[in-house]
Amino acid sequence: MNPLEMQRKGPPRRWCLQVYPTAPKRQRPSRTGHDDDGGFVEKKRGKCGEKQERSDCYCVCVERSRHGRLHFVMC
């Protein structure tokens, strides 16, 4: 890529995505539907079929729309 193209388009973009657990290891549910403190953990399937759990901790979901935009969703 020559310098004129880099001025027009900018440098190539690099994406880095790190995945963190939804809760620390000691807070993960030992039984299905419940966490260690007796609270309920909601389970659902993501778009690609992956399991997502919702507990007292926050996780960030990154979704790409059909228009190529990235959406950050706090769940």
Curated annotation (Swiss-Prot):
Where do the record's region annotations for Disordered lie?
Answer: 24-43
Q: Where in the cell is it found?
A: Nucleus
Q: What is its main location?
A: nucleus
Q: Say which domain of life the source belongs to.
A: Eukaryota
Residue stretches of biased makeup (Basic and acidic residues) = 32-43
Record keywords: ERV, Nucleus, Transposable element
Alphabetical GO CC annotations of the entry are: nucleus
Q: Is the keyword Nucleus in the record?
A: yes
Q: Which residues cross the membrane?
A: none
What is the purpose of this protein? May possess a function in tumorigenesis.
Q: Any further remarks?
A: Protein expressed at very low level.
Report the protein name in the record. Answer: Endogenous retrovirus group K member 7 Np9 protein
Organism, by scientific name, is Homo sapiens
Q: Which gene encodes it?
A: ERVK-7
